[in-house]
């Protein structure tokens, strides 16, 4: 990138000062600067100064850099170019300046998170169509979805192994196994087989999601962990949205829903590539051989505080899922059987209602105020309010505009 400036002596002095914004520079000559710290693999900035007679200087600034955002480079190419030219930290940047390693790890985890988000959505989006093909009713759907939830046991096993085998290797292996188990569901001869494969696949998918969060927390600076979680949440929403995008194939044939389970197979080469490029977690590497020192330390008080926080988060999650899980699982069945929606209509309705919510929640997670503050009161209040509204308020007044648009455009 080449930028021309017409500056006075003060402006020239500013250009000759090492940058400390999106990137931190170090001077290696009078008018040459290289990378000290920042989300770049390489960075070099040079100045060519031509003095004028009236006290002005014509400066040609040449900047060459290679970002560490991996496969997301096309998405960040233009915003990064603007930020580099403006010489300030952009609004979308994390609170802490990330180095090349942290940036690369976050971007690679985001790739896996997209796949994980897709895998975690297929059963809730397709079970109503699968039930129609197999001639089963709502009761069978409920039993199948309840059995699938038992996959949490598989997720706990995955997380336990991660403390012994390492994060990177288990993360990639679990993601590949989840894709294979999901694809196996496309061969289902009955609802029982689909539920069995999804019990394993959803358990592995939950394990992948937990490992991604742990990996990100261990790699990112303390002040940017909420930012990292929000970015990963957006990627999970993108993956879930992709499953919704594919759903209209169910309108083409009664067995068309099976295609949703086959699509993740195309992600296998990408997951293998991520496994080759993703380094092991810094904290896991640092903790190897230091377990005894930790056990011998006086950490009883810390464990008590962490246990209390864990309990608060568990209660908040339980109260949220008591409402959210049944709503998400039976929403498609309600829209298709009771409101007459096609698969394309369900897709449009889901996109219109969930995209703003996902964007807003991720923005809040990356904001300056921790979302978990006061988790006891707000969580209980919101869970009670949502449950009350779902029980006493008709669905049409709340979602009328979205339903009207979906039915008008998708039929």
Regions of interest found by a model, annotated:
Residues 154-167, 360-372:
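Helix-to-loop junctions at the C-terminal end of transmembrane segments
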Residues 224-252, 267:
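Glycine-rich segments within core transmembrane alpha-helices of 12-TM secondary carriers
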Residues 197-234:
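Cytoplasmic helix-loop-helix junction between adjacent transmembrane helices
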């Amino acid at each position: 990138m080449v930028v021309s400036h017409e500056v006075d002596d003060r402006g020239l002095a500013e250009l000759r000062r090492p940058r400390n914004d999106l990137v931190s520079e170090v001077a290696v000559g009078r008018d040459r600067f290289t990378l000290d710290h920042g989300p770049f693999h390489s960075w070099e900035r040079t100045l060519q100064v031509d003095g004028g007679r009236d006290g002005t200087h014509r400066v040609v600034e040449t900047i060459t850099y290679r970002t560490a955002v991996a496969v997301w480079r096309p998405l960040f190419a233009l915003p990064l170019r603007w930020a580099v030219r403006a010489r300030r930290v952009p609004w979308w940047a994390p609170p802490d300046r990330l180095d090349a390693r942290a940036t690369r790890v976050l971007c690679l985890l985001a790739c896996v998170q997209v796949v994980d988000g897709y895998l975690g959505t297929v059963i809730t989006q397709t079970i109503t169509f699968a039930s129609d093909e197999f001639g089963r009713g709502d009761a069978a759907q409920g039993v199948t979805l309840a059995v699938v939830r038992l996959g949490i046991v598989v997720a706990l096993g995955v997380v336990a192994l991660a403390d012994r085998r390492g994060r990177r290797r288990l993360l990639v292996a679990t993601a590949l196994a989840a894709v294979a188990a999901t694809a196996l569901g496309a061969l289902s001869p009955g609802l029982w087989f689909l539920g069995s494969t999804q019990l394993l696949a959803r358990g592995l998918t939950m394990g992948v999601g937990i490992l991604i969060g742990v990996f990100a927390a261990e790699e990112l600076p303390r002040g940017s962990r909420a930012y990292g979680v929000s970015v990963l949440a957006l990627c999970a929403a993108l993956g879930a949205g992709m499953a919704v995008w594919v759903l209209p194939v169910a309108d083409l044939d009664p067995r068309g829903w099976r295609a949703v389970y086959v699509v993740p197979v195309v992600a296998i080469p990408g997951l293998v590539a991520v496994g080759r490029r993703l380094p092991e977690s810094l904290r896991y590497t640092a903790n190897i051989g230091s377990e005894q020192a930790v056990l011998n330390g006086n950490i009883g008080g810390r464990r008590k505080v962490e246990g209390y926080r864990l309990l608060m988060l568990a209660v908040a999650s339980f109260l949220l899922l008591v409402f959210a899980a049944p709503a998400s699982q039976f929403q498609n069945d309600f829209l298709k059987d009771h409101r007459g929606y096609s698969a394309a209509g369900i897709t449009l309705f889901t996109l219109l209602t969930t995209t703003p919510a996902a964007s807003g929640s991720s923005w809040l997670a990356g904001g300056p105020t921790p979302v978990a503050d006061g988790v006891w009161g707000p969580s209980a209040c919101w869970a009670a309010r949502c449950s009350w509204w779902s029980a006493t308020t008709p669905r049409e007044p709340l979602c009328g505009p979205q339903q009207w648009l979906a039915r008008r455009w998708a039929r």
